[in-house]
């Protein structure tokens, strides 16, 4: 029987969890993330549609996510939506640490009825968003569909990832957005996975990300 002390450090998975808080005059946001979770989610942002999308991320990326937010939603959802994206991005970056051993790249195409969305991402350390959604309505329920892009802008900038989103088909706004979040989650699940062939190695020819 081999004890854990006999296992090389490079094969021991680090704790990939983070908790981040952000407080401004407009919002108060707390995010806890566990990249090696099982898809559990508790999302209470005051924005029901955003909560639903955060649940898609947790479920389809198989991460545990706890997001609490209060904000000036009596004005509109913009500040809370953006600050949740910022805080989630910061928590994701912190949980990834030095990124040793991760696959780094992820890609997925998700269908939802008539909608089809392609997502590719890279935890490169270089924030970039290429956003190609054409959402036909201004709102889904009470949620302003312009805020989808604002959420991903905030998330990308603060997680330092490169993210490409392409809508291949779709006419229903809810389906397009939900397919996007599902594709993003599945691509992220691939990218954050540990590659046993690269255990303890930063996945870059430069040696740093």
Swiss-Prot record:
A GO biological process of this protein is:
L-histidine biosynthetic process
List the Gene3D superfamilies hit by this protein, alphabetically: Imidazole glycerol phosphate dehydratase, domain 1
Keywords, sorted A to Z: Amino-acid biosynthesis, Cytoplasm, Histidine biosynthesis, Lyase
The Gene Ontology terms for molecular function here are:
imidazoleglycerol-phosphate dehydratase activity
Name the Pfam families for this protein: IGPD
Lineage top rank: taxon: Bacteria
> What GO cellular-component annotations does this UniProt entry give?
cytoplasm
Q: What pathway is it annotated to? A: Amino-acid biosynthesis; L-histidine biosynthesis; L-histidine from 5-phospho-alpha-D-ribose 1-diphosphate: step 6/9
Primary localisation category: cytoplasm
* EC number of this enzyme: 4.2.1.19
* Catalytic function, reaction form: D-erythro-1-(imidazol-4-yl)glycerol 3-phosphate = 3-(imidazol-4-yl)-2-oxopropyl phosphate + H2O
Where found?
Answer: Cytoplasm
What is the similarity comment for this entry?
Belongs to the imidazoleglycerol-phosphate dehydratase family.
Question: This chain belongs to which protein, by name?
Answer: Imidazoleglycerol-phosphate dehydratase
Q: In the record, what lineage is assigned to the organism producing the protein? A: Bacteria, Bacillati, Cyanobacteriota, Cyanophyceae, Oscillatoriophycideae
């Amino acid at each position: 029987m081999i004890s854990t002390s006999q296992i090389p450090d490079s094969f021991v998975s680090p704790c990939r969890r983070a908790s981040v808080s952000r407080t401004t005059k407009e919002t108060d946001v707390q995010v806890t993330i566990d990249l090696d979770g099982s898809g559990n989610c508790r999302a209470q942002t005051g924005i029901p549609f955003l909560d639903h999308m955060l649940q898609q991320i947790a479920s389809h990326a198989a991460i545990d996510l706890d997001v609490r937010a209060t904000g000036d939603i009596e004005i509109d959802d913009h500040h809370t939506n953006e600050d949740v994206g910022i805080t989630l991005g910061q928590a994701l970056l912190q949980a990834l640490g030095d990124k040793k051993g991760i696959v780094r790249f992820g890609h997925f195409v998700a269908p939802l009825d008539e909608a089809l969305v392609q997502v590719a991402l890279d935890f490169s350390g270089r924030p970039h968003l290429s956003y190609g959604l054409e959402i036909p309505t201004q709102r889904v329920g009470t949620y302003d569909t312009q805020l989808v892009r604002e959420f991903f802008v905030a998330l990308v900038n603060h997680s330092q990832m490169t993210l490409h989103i392409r809508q291949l088909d779709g006419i229903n706004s809810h389906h397009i957005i939900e397919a996007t979040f599902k594709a993003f989650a599945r691509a992220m699940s691939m990218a954050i996975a540990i590659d046993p062939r690269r255990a303890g190695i930063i996945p870059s020819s430069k040696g740093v990300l």
